[in-house]
Amino acid sequence: MKLLNLFQSEEALVKACQKGDPNAQRRIYEKYSSKMLGICFRYAHDDYEAEGIMIEGFVKVFDKIDSFKLEGSFEGWIRRIMVNESLMYL
């Protein structure tokens, strides 16, 4: 079964990730990594550095996922982490 079919909603995906499910973590990364790389690239202007910033950002996403309260946009929450991580790079 593909990862796309394992989680019926974003809320279920986040809850599974909060419980430490590695499949949920992979799915979140696959779903958002291309958009988040674009955000990081706007700050880094170098593919290698942007990818490093994005990876550090996802480490924070998974480390802090318990602080996301399922209110508001999950993508927006991830985006804010990526922007903050990018600003720390500058």
Functional labels for PLM-detected ranges:
Residues 11-18, 58, 62:
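Regular secondary-structure segments
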Residues 28-32, 36, 82-85:
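Hydrophobic/aromatic residues within well-ordered alpha-helical segments
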Residues 1-8, 12-15:
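Intrinsic, short, N-terminal disordered tails of RNA polymerase sigma-factor systems
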Residues 38, 52-59, 72-84:
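Structural recognition of an alpha-helix C-terminal capping motif at a helix-to-coil junction
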